[in-house]
Amino acid sequence: LWYLVGGFSFFYFMRYKGLTIFSSFFGAFSFTLFPHYQALWAEGHFTKFRAIMMLPLVIFAAHYFFNNRNILGAVLFALSFGNQIRTQHYQIVFYTALLIFSIGVYPFLKDIIEKKWRKIIHSISLLLVSIICSLCLSAQPLFLASEYLPFSSRGTNTVDLSKKNEDQNVSSGLDLQYATQWSTHPSSIFDWLIPRF
């Protein structure tokens, strides 16, 4: 199912951007059968796989919203982004949010330069409502994640069952060095295209 979501979303996004049917199909086919996804399945990173498969739909919805600034675009964006957040892979969701921001900067700056204040207020209102709807759509997994966060290695304290209670380390979660290291080192990019490179 997730392969279909990613493939069809990529295909329609490419068609929306003006590519031919053949080019769109080849792009969607290449995106869907990327070798890295097999590694995600094998290593148990299914949440990351689902979040990546939602990426073309979210980007398509963001482009559509920023080009048209209407309710249909806001609804499409809210549904797609909310469903991506529901996949619970917050690293990919964060990268998607950065990508959405980079897509939306130019139209808003253009409107500011042209002093289209009414259009800016309308667009920001629709965008805020759609982000709130996205968060409401994904509230259940977000609340669960916030509930178990203090007991996660990314939260405040973890328990080591091999140590006595008085020997436990009290920490404030991940240190900055660990949290900001590469999840995929740049030299591993060749492995995405050619496995075991």
Tell what function each PLM region has.
Residues Y3-K17, I21-D111, S123-A145, F151:
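Membrane-embedded helix bundles of polyisoprenyl
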Residues K119:
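Aromatic-residue-lined binding/catalytic grooves and analogous aromatic/hydrophobic interfacial grooves
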Residues Q140-F197:
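Periplasmic/ER-lumenal interhelical loops and adjacent helix-loop junctions
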Residues I112-K116:
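Membrane-helix interface linkers and caps
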